[in-house]
Amino acid sequence: MTSAVGTSGTAITSRVHSLNRPNMVSVGTIVWLSSELMFFAGLFAMYFTARAQSGGKWPPPPTELNLYQAVPVTLVLIASSFTCQMGVFAAERGDVFGLRRWYVITFLMGLFFVLGQGYEYYHLMGHGTTIPGSAYGSVFYLATGFHDLHVTGGLVAFIFLLARTAMSKFTPAQATASIVVSYYWHFVDIVWIALFTVIYFIR
């Protein structure tokens, strides 16, 4: 009996430790995120090109960016990286309840960000900043819009992951999936920090 318990404990420990080893899913995700980084680099290049060719005030009237609204939304998204990582730590310990708790919090923070961005779009469009209205409108909505789509994709990933952990026994494969989702979430957070800095502070 003691031998059986010892064998079981060794197997669980081995599976947990295996999460720290590189695997094809994690490596593939990193390679894919590298290609996504190049995509966003193209959007940054487009933004700076439009800015260089504007020859006037940037952003041009009637655009009025609301920094006081953007800062709290940004801080919430940054904080969501920490809650996401806490979920990863829970997954590595085999703590499915901790994983769910932290990932639900992360999901809600990401949703808050998306809704905040939607409100900013509503405000800007109401003041005449549109895609066909100016070069600034085009590059602003393209850059931030594609980022919002990526954040939304992350929210969908959280939903699927949480559903999987609720419908079946927690497995090392699910723990690996949670780690992969965290890679993606950290990526969209880092991209937003760069976008936020460029759009709101580099005039």
Swiss-Prot record:
Annotated GO biological process: aerobic electron transport chain
Q: Is Membrane there in the keyword field?
A: yes
Any one Gene Ontology molecular-function term assigned to this protein's record:
cytochrome-c oxidase activity
Q: Which Pfam families match?
A: COX3
Q: Its GO CC terms?
A: plasma membrane
- Main localization is membrane
Q: Sorted alphabetically, which InterPro entries does this protein's record hold?
A: Cyt_c/ubiquinol_Oxase_su3 (IPR024791), Cyt_c_oxidase-like_su3 (IPR000298), Cyt_c_oxidase_su3-like_sf (IPR035973), Cyt_c_oxidase_su3_a-hlx (IPR013833)
Question: What does the UniProt entry say about where the protein is found?
Answer: Cell membrane
Stretches that traverse the bilayer = 30-50, 70-90, 102-122, 142-162, 179-199
Which reaction(s) does its UniProt entry say it catalyses?
A: 4 Fe(II)-[cytochrome c] + O2 + 8 H(+)(in) = 4 Fe(III)-[cytochrome c] + 2 H2O + 4 H(+)(out)
Topology relative to the membrane, per the entry?
Multi-pass membrane protein
Keywords attached to this entry: Cell membrane, Membrane, Translocase, Transmembrane, Transmembrane helix
EC number in record: 7.1.1.9
What is the name listed in the Swiss-Prot or TrEMBL entry for this protein?
A: Probable cytochrome c oxidase subunit 3
Organism of origin is: Mycolicibacterium paratuberculosis (strain ATCC BAA-968 / K-10)
Q: Which gene encodes it?
A: ctaE
